[in-house]
């Protein structure tokens, strides 16, 4: 492999005129022996210019991520390309050195490479990585340290989320490395250069990945933990060099000194929260938690109090450092030991740290003025909450006020003082209201406060709606949102709250205010009984305002708001549904114009999904208005067409849901034209979305069977999709859905002349059973296709089975099918599946010519019926119970005081501890799908796809059919009757008698229901005579 040829090709990829030819040349060469090794040599060559090396390392990374592991292939298949072992050996030998000596831009790509190599090769093929890491870690050449630590980090990252029992190779390696890392760190502490601090930060990142989800107690004992805690405290406590203050404030968090502090605090907060809180940890950490709390928690807290003091004194503090500090302090509130140390400081922390963090800031004002849309995005970004010091401050405030005495009272006194101060700074008022709103949940449960909250709103919040300051109007809406459950004594106050919020939504000139108003208005309507009526006359302008804001802001929270409003005002929305849907469709098209790589595209995707769900909600609201639904259909089809034709995979799920909603009542000619497009999408890139397509396909089959059967191409397309799923690699859930759809078609088309399809359907389902099946659900669902065919036409099924031949299966398919079915009869769950089994068995035993295999298993048949009917009895009872369940369980008003702790009490989360132990136990056990069953009376997941036999108005009653067939057999074929019944014991005979009695009761009840439905009288409960006797011999038998 000539390196120069590859170098020239790599150089060519950077020239637009040569790129296509260069890429073709590389793609032709990439499977050659030594190609990958040569790429690594090029990447490491300092003689080459950096862009060529970068192009080489990116190509190398793509090769390793795609082609490194060996691939398993089925016998007879061609093995896919993987990197030859000779090349892999060369890469393993050299990649560590490449990472150590490469510049940052190359190194970052190489660490991705080594991550993949470790994932597939350690420890089975590459134990030498541990020796290499050990060698360079112990080297006195500090220039090697950062690179080798990046290699070690990738080793640890590969085990970060694994169960404890799977981490033994890592633990064995870290037995050697952890002491070395600690010694290196102590050695580096005196060196405050940026290179030294970068290395320190990397050691912390390794330590964090090691302990984030599992604490390896065999590695970390009290002695070495003492040393690590001292290191961590030292880093948190040390001053950052003064010259860092010359750096722009926005750039400071990226400096190594602040990053190092951030990771130190990450570790401390994680150790305390996950492993160091007695009463809140799983039992294997109980001893560690006691040690941590008594030996370390207070000492660490002291250092962190100093951090908060520095912040109070207006010294710069990186946001993540402050956030993690507050997280640690928050954990300390729950424990008497740390609380005792914290208690004298808590009021100072609330007033001097939490309060300033909760006030509107200069940075907020700058963003509001320069980019109000970005301001909205930031305030509603859940990921921002995970890293925001303001959210951490809010959490600490809530914990302290809910768990410790006097804190709430003093905090409310502080807030009240600010609110009543005549010329208070508006930003301070904003902070005070922010604090009060954050405590709403506690305040509304406390007798002393909950009655005062209405007056607080009246006196301190309502006046802010006329403030000149946008952020104060937004805060007023926000407070109403958080106090939406307040019990208004005055209707006038409730009306004022609604009117002020409505006006903000419709008339305010500032978008962040409109957004807060939209959310506040919706929660008030949902939580205040009289609110809905008040807003009813304004519903059109309210909805128009909401649609406008969604288009302007593309904010996902608002799509949730509008969905809830549509459900609240379904009648009022119906006349404007078409206008709303047009608006939403235009907004959707606007949102999806963002390319996948553009900034904010993830947020936009979530918003787009919300818009599609909103359109779906509108469809459900107008489903009884046929003419409106028809108008909506055209708009929706344009949206559906856009997504499917442009292959925007991330919206397939919502699009198929929309199409399903459009076909629930009828299937229009336009919706039938959609089926070929759905089929085409399935063939191209929609294979993995079959379960999302299923409700739509089910509608095509059941809602408009006439059209389905009017053109063979429709059934061919649906069968082809099911067949592809059953023979492909879609997974067992999708395969269950495919088999279910075949069963639905067979049942729906009984008597409709699809005899030629039955052999194809049955073969597709039973062929799947010749390959490995992991779940009983798939096994029974495939059997059920054949059972449905038996119910459709017993002779046709048996002929089909006789003609079927599967490889490696000597036994006749008929025998195998019936044996398997009877053996698995206890695996059929829910109402439909058991009913189908009963109907199938009835069809089988009622045949004039009994198949030979049935004589061999005749003793199993009635016990199978009994098992199924017992299950059906439970399933019907459960179904009736669900029907009668009233949803309006009155929630007992929680008047309880939230329980506060004494200063010497710990907050022990007993439920949480038990939950952690259950999770730990489950993590250690492999779930066995084969044996696991949910309550067998519950509806199964696939029962939602109803069939013609599940129609309650015209039921096919399995009890009556069974009884009728059994009476027929008793009279027509005494020998067969005797074969079926001779092995029954007394208990089984009694159970069969009960089934017969229940059959008569169900017939009488159904007749009564029909007469009542048609205006007749209602039967009283009938007295049902026993119709035949299972106790005696069959007629004519001696």
UniProtKB/Swiss-Prot annotation:
The record's similarity note reads:
Belongs to the importin beta family.
Which organism encodes this protein?
A: Homo sapiens (Human)
Which Pfam families does the record associate with it? Cse1, IBN_N
- Cysteines joined through disulfide linkages: none
Give the chief site where it resides.
Answer: cytoplasm
Q: What is this protein called?
A: Importin-7
Q: Name one GO molecular function term.
A: histone binding
A biological-process GO annotation: negative regulation of osteoblast differentiation
Gene name, per UniProt, is: IPO7
Provide this UniProt record's keywords sorted from A to Z.
Acetylation, Cytoplasm, Host-virus interaction, Nucleus, Phosphoprotein, Protein transport, Transport
Q: Which residues carry this modification: N-acetylmethionine?
A: 1
Give the organism's phylogenetic lineage. Eukaryota, Metazoa, Chordata, Craniata, Vertebrata
Annotated positions of the Phosphothreonine modification = 898
Question: Does the entry feature the keyword Cytoplasm, yes or no?
Answer: yes
* Domain of life where this protein originates: Eukaryota
**Listed Gene3D superfamilies:** Leucine-rich Repeat Variant
What does the subunit comment say? Forms a heterodimer with KPNB1. Interacts with histone H1. Interacts with H2A, H2B, H3 and H4 histones. Interacts with SNUPN and XPO1. Interacts with RPS7 and RPL5. Interacts with RPL23A (via BIB domain). Binds directly to nuclear pore complexes. Interacts with SMAD4 and NUP93; translocates SMAD4 to the nucleus through the NPC upon BMP7 stimulation resulting in activation of SMAD4 signaling. Interacts with phosphorylated SMAD2; the interaction facilitates translocation of SMAD2 to the nucleus. Interacts with SRP19. (Microbial infection) Interacts with HIV-1 reverse transcription complex integrase and rev.
* Feature: compositional bias, Acidic residues: 884-910
Which PROSITE patterns did the record assign?
IMPORTIN_B_NT (PS50166)
Give the function comment from the record: Functions in nuclear protein import, either by acting as autonomous nuclear transport receptor or as an adapter-like protein in association with the importin-beta subunit KPNB1. Acting autonomously, is thought to serve itself as receptor for nuclear localization signals (NLS) and to promote translocation of import substrates through the nuclear pore complex (NPC) by an energy requiring, Ran-dependent mechanism.
What is a single cellular component term in the Gene Ontology annotation?
nuclear pore
Q: Where is this region: Disordered?
A: 881-910
Q: Which residues carry this modification: Phosphoserine?
A: 886, 903, 1020
Record localization: Cytoplasm; Nucleus
């Amino acid at each position: 492999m000539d390196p120069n040829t590859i170098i020239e090709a790599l150089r060519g990829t950077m020239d637009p005129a040569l790129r296509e030819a260069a890429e073709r040349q590389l793609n032709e060469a990439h499977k050659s022996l030594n190609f990958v090794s040569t790429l690594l040599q090029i990447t490491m060559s300092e003689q080459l210019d950096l862009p060529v090396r970068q192009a080489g390392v990116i190509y190398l990374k793509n090769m390793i991520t795609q082609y490194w592991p060996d691939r398993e292939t089925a016998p007879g298949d061609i093995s896919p390309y993987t990197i030859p072992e000779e090349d892999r050996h060369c890469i393993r030998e050299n990649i560590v050195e490449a990472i150590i000596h490469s510049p940052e831009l190359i190194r970052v790509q190489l660490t991705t490479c080594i991550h993949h190599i470790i994932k597939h090769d350690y420890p089975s093929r590459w134990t030498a990585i541990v020796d290499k890491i050990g060698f360079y870690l112990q080297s006195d050449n500090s220039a090697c340290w950062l690179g080798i630590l990046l290699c070690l980090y990738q080793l640890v990252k590969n085990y970060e989320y694994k169960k404890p029992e799977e981490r033994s190779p890592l633990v064995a390696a870290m037995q050697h490395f952890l002491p070395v890392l600690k010694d290196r760190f102590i050695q580096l502490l005196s060196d405050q250069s940026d290179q030294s601090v970068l290395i320190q930060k990397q050691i912390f990142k390794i330590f964090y990945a090691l302990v984030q989800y599992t604490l390896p107690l065999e590695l970390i004992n009290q002695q070495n933990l003492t040393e690590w805690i001292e290191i961590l405290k030292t880093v948190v406590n040390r001053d950052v060099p003064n010259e860092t203050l010359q750096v722009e404030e926005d750039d400071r968090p990226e400096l190594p000194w602040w990053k190092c502090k951030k990771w130190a605090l990450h570790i401390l907060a994680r150790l305390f929260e996950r492993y160091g809180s007695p009463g809140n940890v799983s039992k294997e950490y109980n001893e560690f938690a006691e040690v941590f709390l008594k030996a370390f928690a207070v000492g660490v807290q002291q250092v962190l109090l100093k951090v908060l003091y520095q912040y109070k004194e207006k010294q710069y503090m990186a946001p993540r450092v402050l956030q993690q500090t507050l997280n640690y302090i928050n954990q300390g509130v729950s424990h008497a030991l740390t609380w005792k140390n914290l208690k004298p400081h808590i009021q100072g922390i609330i007033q001097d740290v939490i309060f300033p963090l909760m006030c509107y800031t200069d940075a907020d004002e700058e963003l509001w003025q320069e980019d109000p849309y970005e301001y909205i995005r930031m305030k509603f970004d859940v990921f921002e909450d995970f890293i925001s010091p303001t959210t951490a401050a809010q959490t600490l405030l809530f914990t302290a006020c809910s768990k410790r005495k006097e804190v709430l009272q003093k905090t409310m006194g502080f807030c009240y003082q600010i609110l009543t101060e005549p010329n208070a700074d508006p930003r301070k008022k904003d902070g005070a209201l922010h604090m009060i709103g954050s405590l709403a949940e506690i305040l509304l449960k406390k007798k002393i406060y909950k009655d005062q909250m209405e007056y607080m709103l009246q006196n301190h919040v309502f006046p802010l709606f006329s403030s000149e300051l946008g952020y104060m109007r937004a805060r007023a809406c926000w407070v109403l949102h958080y106090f939406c459950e307040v019990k208004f004594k005055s209707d006038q106050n409730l009306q004022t709250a609604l009117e002020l919020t409505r006006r903000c939504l419709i008339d305010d000139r500032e978008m962040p205010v409109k957004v807060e108003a939209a959310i506040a208005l919706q929660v008030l309507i949902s939580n205040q009984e009289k609110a809905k009526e008040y807003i009813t006359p304004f519903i059109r302008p309210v909805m128009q305002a909401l649609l406008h804001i969604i288009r302007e802001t593309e904010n996902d929270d608002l799509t949730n708001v509008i969905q809830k409003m549509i459900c609240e005002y379904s009648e009022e929305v119906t006349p404007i549904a078409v206008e709303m849907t047009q608006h939403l469709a235009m907004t959707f098209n606007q949102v999806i114009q963002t390319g996948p790589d553009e900034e904010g595209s993830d947020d936009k995707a979530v918003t787009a999904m919300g818009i599609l769900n909103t359109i779906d909600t509108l469809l459900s609201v107008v489903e009884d208005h046929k003419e409106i639904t028809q108008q909506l259909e055209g708009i929706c089809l344009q949206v559906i067409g856009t997504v499917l034709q442009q292959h925007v995979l991330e919206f397939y799920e919502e699009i198929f849901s929309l199409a399903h909603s459009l076909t629930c009542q009828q299937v229009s000619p336009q919706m039938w034209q959609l089926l070929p497009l759905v089929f085409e999408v399935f063939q191209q890139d929609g294979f993995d979305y079959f379960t999302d397509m299923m409700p739509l396909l089910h509608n095509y089959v059941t809602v408009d069977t006439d059209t389905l059967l009017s053109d063979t191409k429709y059934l061919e397309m649906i069968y082809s999709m099911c067949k592809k799923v059953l023979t492909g690699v879609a997974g067992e859930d999708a395969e269950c859905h495919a088999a279910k759809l075949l069963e639905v078609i067979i049942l729906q088309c009984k008597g409709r002349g699809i005899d030629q399809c039955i052999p194809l359907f049955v073969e597709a389902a039973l062929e799947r059973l010749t390959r490995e099946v992991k779940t009983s659900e798939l096994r029974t669902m495939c059997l059920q296709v054949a059972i449905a065919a038996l119910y459709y036409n017993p002779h046709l099924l048996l002929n089909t089975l006789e003609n079927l031949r599967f490889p490696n299966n000597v036994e006749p398919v008929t025998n195998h099918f019936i044996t398997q079915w009877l053996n698995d009869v206890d695996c059929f769950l829910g109402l439909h599946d058991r009913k189908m089994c009963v109907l199938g068995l009835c069809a089988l035993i009622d045949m004039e010519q009994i198949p030979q295999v049935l004589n061999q298993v005749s003793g199993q048949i009635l016990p199978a019926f009994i098992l199924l009917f017992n299950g059906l009895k439970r399933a019907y009872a459960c179904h009736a119970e669900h029907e009668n369940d009233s949803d309006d369980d009155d929630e007992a008003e929680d008047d309880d005081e939230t329980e506060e702790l004494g200063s010497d009490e710990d907050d022990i989360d007993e439920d949480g501890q038990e939950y952690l132990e259950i999770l730990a136990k489950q993590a250690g056990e492999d779930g066995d799908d084969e044996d696991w069953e949910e309550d067998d009376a519950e509806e199964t997941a696939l029962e939602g796809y109803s069939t013609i036999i599940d129609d309650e108005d015209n039921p096919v009653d399995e009890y009556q059919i069974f009884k009728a067939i059994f009476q027929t057999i008793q009279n027509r074929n005494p020998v067969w009757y005797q074969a079926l019944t001779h092995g029954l014991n007394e208990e089984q005979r009694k159970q069969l008698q009960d089934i017969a009695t229940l059959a008569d009761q169900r017939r009488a009840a159904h007749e009564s229901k029909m007469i009542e439905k048609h205006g007749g009288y209602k039967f009283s409960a009938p007295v049902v005579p026993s119709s035949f006797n299972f106790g005696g011999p069959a007629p004519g038998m001696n």
